[in-house]
């Protein structure tokens, strides 16, 4: 394996460790969580639309999402392994027979709609993703609770140490005052 592919594989593994994208394909309506930096502030912005294409492979893979914003079609290309993509949530599965849905650019209204895939495979994928999402939320919540408990224990230990130090200082002060009398 040459150096470039090795570096790409390392970067892909690093990003995969942070977040795992669900399995989606053209025709699916997705909500992409994108990290946006405005000045010094960074926030996560949702971009919801229909996946009209997936291109590339490996580390260079990307997908195009199209949405209609104020009557104007807007398309955005997201690299799959971009650190700016926080996550992808599948809103609904589309039933299409093409890999590239560029024909949607010329369509408006009802003709631009994509029927929902209600097949067994789509239901299975949706259930798996829902279970994975719930497990991830439970894990994050458990981490928050553990962090809160650790912080409470640390605060209690700090307060106990402060009380002990104050009691020792008071005892030393009392010991100093007693021999003088």
Curated annotation (Swiss-Prot):
Gene3D superfamilies recorded: 2.30.30.790
Biased composition, class Basic and acidic residues, residue ranges: 162-173
Pfam families noted in UniProt: Ribosomal_L19
Gene designation per UniProt: rplS
Keyword Ribosomal protein applies: yes
UniProt protein name: Large ribosomal subunit protein bL19
Organism of origin: Mesorhizobium japonicum (strain LMG 29417 / CECT 9101 / MAFF 303099)
Region annotated Disordered, chain positions: 162-181
Functional description taken from the UniProt entry: This protein is located at the 30S-50S ribosomal subunit interface and may play a role in the structure and function of the aminoacyl-tRNA binding site.
Family membership: Belongs to the bacterial ribosomal protein bL19 family.
Family annotation (SUPFAM superfamilies): Translation proteins SH3-like domain
GO cellular component, one term: cytosolic large ribosomal subunit
BP-aspect Gene Ontology terms: translation
Molecular function via GO: structural constituent of ribosome
Keyword Coiled coil in annotation: no
Assigned keywords, A-Z: Ribonucleoprotein, Ribosomal protein
